[in-house]
Amino acid sequence: MIKKSIYPKTTRVKCKFDVVEVTEKLDGSNLCIFKKDDMLHIAQRNKILRFDELEDNKNVIYKGLYQWLLDNLDMLQTIRNDSVVCGEWIGMGKLKYSVDEFDKRFYMFAKANINDDFELCNIQYNHEHFIYPFETLEIPKCIGVVPVAYRISYLPSKDNLDVLYARYCEKVNRNVEGFIVNYRDHIEKYVRMKNGTLQDHFDRVE
């Protein structure tokens, strides 16, 4: 006989509903910057590159990224070992962003850790936790944070998001690709623009 409980405890329903954070989905390219064994790395699409490999691979990394990394190296070196900064590299998509509103090239949307197999773990989307990958406990000036569109106290349906999207577009007075809905560090995307063209949101198996 083995004396052990294998079924996990069920979490209690909270008396007070958690806040649902709705952030703007930027039209950018996914980029992760992390440090492993004191060496900075970048991860884009299906490639992971050490900082000392970048010069020989300038032709395969995002446009403008190599020089940006060189210009901001001192600030990026404050990333802790095994910590990951996840975000959007903007400027290559169909939607164009005004420098007055978006004065950065890289906008953080998550923090994480990386294991020895170069897999992400402990991914967190709460903006209050975004300082922790950095030794200074400050987000470097070269890194922005994705805009928060709404903080609401209910899980929005598609119809709710349609209304929120229309209001947000009117508020910012520009095209918006969509939203990311974050509830308890579980995210789902609501997409309204594809290749720069407005469309209705629909479910699709990725």
Where are these regions (language model features)?
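Core nucleotide-handling region used for phosphoryl-transfer chemistry
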Residues: 1-206
